[in-house]
Every structure is written in C-alpha cells, then in structure tokens.
Amino acid sequence: MDIEEYYDKIYRFCYYKVQSKELAEDLTQETFLRFFDSEYKEQGMCIRYLYTIARNLCIEAYRKNKWDELSDDISDEGIEADNIVDIVFVRQALSKLSDEDRELLIMRYMNGETISDICEVTGSSRFALYRKLKKAKKEFEKLVEGGFFGE
C-alpha cells in the first residue's frame, strides 16, 4: 500500500466535497486513523475502504455543517493566475452537481480510479456506473460550456 498516493487521492476527494483545505486535511487524517484502527486486512482493496471511510466522514461533516465556503488560500499554493481561474471555475461547476455525480467525477477523472474500484465503493454495477458517469460528465460539460452563473 502506497500511503502517500492514497493520502493524496483521499485528500483531493475530501477537498472537493467540503471545499475547505483545513477540513479536508482533518477528514483525510481521520480517514487514515480509522483505517489503521480497523480490523481491515483485505489486500488490494484498501483504496475502496478508504473512500468509504472518507465519504462517511464528509457526510458527517456536512451534517454538522462544519466547513466554510470556498477558501481563498489557492494563492498561497503558488499557482499561476490563469490556473487559479480554471481551478475556481471547475470547483464551482462541480459544486452545482449532485453529491453522487461530483463523487463519481472526482474518483474517476481526478483520482484516476478504475471502474471496478468505483463500483466497489459505490455498490453500483458496471453498467449502472457507466450510465451514471456518462450522465455526470454530460451535466458537468453542460455547466462548463453553457455557463452556470445564470448568464
């Protein structure tokens, strides 16, 4: 198990769900603490279990309403201005999607998870997952191409 690679994927997953750097870091750390405290021993399935823990923690955080709005700490990361606009644009488009669509797009296209892994995490069949991904991608593209600011 490559902890750093998994850590980055879980962090990105949490970050795009909660839109707060600090809360995403906390949730990622809590995900790994719960993972290592658990009795989970199945080899090769770690990332699936980590996503499940992370998703549940994000849901808990949402229910407790503990995160702030989109933080402006992007500039602290040394990213060029054009890239900041793109990042903010993508985040805002993602925020307009349903939780399920956002999760699927993050896992598949940002974290590069396999269809099999996503099926395991979500409990969907391959066929259903392909349909959901196609729908989510189409909705995302519609938001990006058509604008989502009410223009």
Whereabouts are the PLM-identified features?
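Arg/Lys-rich amphipathic alpha helix in sigma70-family domain 2
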Residues: M45, T52-D72
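A short, charge-rich alpha-helical start-of-domain segment used by transcription regulators
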Residues: M1-R12, Y16, E22-E25, R102
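Acidic, proline/glycine-rich intrinsically disordered inter-domain spacer in sigma factors
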Residues: N65, D72-S95
